[in-house]
Amino acid sequence: MSKSHSEAGSAFIQTQQLHAAMADTFLEHMCRLDIDSAPITARNTGIICTIGPASRSVETLKEMIKSGMNVARMNFSHGTHEYHAETIKNVRTATESFASDPILYRPVAVALDTKGPEIRTGLIKGSGTAEVELKKGATLKITLDNAYMEKCDENILWLDYKNICKVVDVGSKVYVDDGLISLQVKQKGPDFLVTEVENGGFLGSKKGVNLPGAAVDLPAVSEKDIQDLKFGVEQDVDMVFASFIRKAADVHEVRKILGEKGKNIKIISKIENHEGVRRFDEILEASDGIMVARGDLGIEIPAEKVFLAQKMIIGRCNRAGKPVICATQMLESMIKKPRPTRAEGSDVANAVLDGADCIMLSGETAKGDYPLEAVRMQHLIAREAEAAMFHRKLFEELARSSSHSTDLMEAMAMGSVEASYKCLAAALIVLTESGRSAHQVARYRPRAPIIAVTRNHQTARQAHLYRGIFPVVCKDPVQEAWAEDVDLRVNLAMNVGKARGFFKKGDVVIVLTGWRPGSGFTNTMRVVPVP
């Protein structure tokens, strides 16, 4: 499977950690990692950025796309439809500003993140950005009286969950703002709770509330979610991040609301509570992909167990060949500082090493002081971590875990990735209509980037969900002769790869094409030197 280092020669562009990637044992692999080994130019992991006040101007979005943003996430827990419509328009304007050059054009996907059946606090009186300090030991009254909806302060807090007094008991815990603030219930009334502040801190407006252990009876898809999903279909979003998915039926419900018109929208289920982890397999089967939403997960299950859930979820998604996103607090300190903590750098790298297809930024890009730096940081860390994957072992295990199927595309994908290791290919070029061929290749985790050429804009945008796929949109009209059309698209991929520094003249690339037009006919693999 491996050539010796010297044999690969200096012409080979991808020296990144090759020695370590081809080790025989995991210990040997770790021992061979080298801090002076340069990573490959391409980054294989997708970067998802939440767009908010700090990043929604067209100019900032252009810079974020240049810095490496692949998917723009709209968080529907905040903002009106008009606000999000404008943000989506800005994202598309920024994306299309690069469209004049087919080689530099990067399709950016739009993701709608539903509010889901969550509980949130009201507005702190004053302004939307006002905060109040809750001191440890102080008494805080939680009320359902709508008179306080926009008048919360350090003494009284309004919540939007009408049944809270029925599901919590005296002695129960109430967590606010990803668990940063904890309250203990001391007394219950018909429409209020009296609590004592256990862990204090500064509280802002519209923060999430968790009631671990309580049987919260909220519907999987709220009335607001239904309106938001319909709005998403109108706006032609590429994917939905569905919050608080607890079982397969929840996913089917989201799919039903998206309807015929939204049937191509990918549904990514967010796993953020104990039931979601426990019933993970049925959720995975019903979904197009998964997000490990570590914020709420870390309150609903003990904080020290979150990494177990993360590894289990990523492992099962990799095995099933479905995309998985790691999210929440990845570079949290960069909201206020230009550099991440060492722990955060490690966290991003380890999510990539675990096998995440995408990594996500939330507050870092939505409201932080350093949105561009955060994107660049994720880009740099992801590239280094990808090079340090134990590729040889990973490929063997993925190949072994895939069942013997009559699906020819799967055999092609596995064969092309194995060939790419054997001949140290600098890239794999895949011509794809629906994107399926490229997704199958990505499933086997080649070291080299997969340049997927398609004429379908949505296929290109959604391809960012899969690790390693670099989508290229072919805007040229279809040629009459099939062979000429194939050559046209392969040449476009060659030009993009050279312009991006993925490979240079004389390197070897693997080209996967179909033998006739249409989806589902990819069956030809060639090993081609770069002209």
Curated annotation (Swiss-Prot):
Residues 307-531 are annotated as: Interaction with POU5F1. There is a cross-link at residue 166 (Glycyl lysine isopeptide (Lys-Gly) (interchain with G-Cter in SUMO1)). There are 4 isozymes of pyruvate kinase in mammals (L, R, M1, M2) encoded by 2 different genes: PKLR and PKM. The L and R isozymes are generated from the PKLR by differential splicing of RNA; the M1 and M2 forms are produced from the PKM gene by differential splicing. L type is major isozyme in the liver, R is found in red cells, M1 is the main form in muscle, heart and brain, and M2 is found in early fetal tissues as well as in most cancer cells. The modification Phosphotyrosine is found at residues 105, 148, 175. The keyword Transferase applies. Beta-D-fructose 1,6-bisphosphate binds at residues 432-437, 482, 489, 516-521. It comes from Oryctolagus cuniculus (Rabbit). This is Pyruvate kinase PKM. The modification N6-succinyllysine is found at residues 66, 166, 322, 498. The modification Phosphothreonine is found at residues 41, 195. Belongs to the pyruvate kinase family. The modification Phosphoserine is found at residues 37, 97, 100, 127. Substrate binds at residues 73, 270, 295-296, 328. Pathway: Carbohydrate degradation; glycolysis; pyruvate from D-glyceraldehyde 3-phosphate: step 5/5. CDD domains: Pyruvate_Kinase. K(+) binds at residues 75, 77, 113-114. The record marks 270 as: Transition state stabilizer. GO terms for molecular function: ATP binding; magnesium ion binding; mRNA binding; potassium ion binding; protein tyrosine kinase activity; pyruvate kinase activity. The keyword Nucleus applies. Mg(2+) binds at residues 272, 296. The modification N6,N6,N6-trimethyllysine is found at residue 3. ISGylated. Keywords: Acetylation, Allosteric enzyme, ATP-binding, Cytoplasm, Glycolysis, Isopeptide bond, Kinase, Magnesium, Metal-binding, Methylation, Nucleotide-binding, Nucleus, Phosphoprotein, Potassium, Pyruvate, S-nitrosylation, Transferase, Translation regulation, Ubl conjugation.
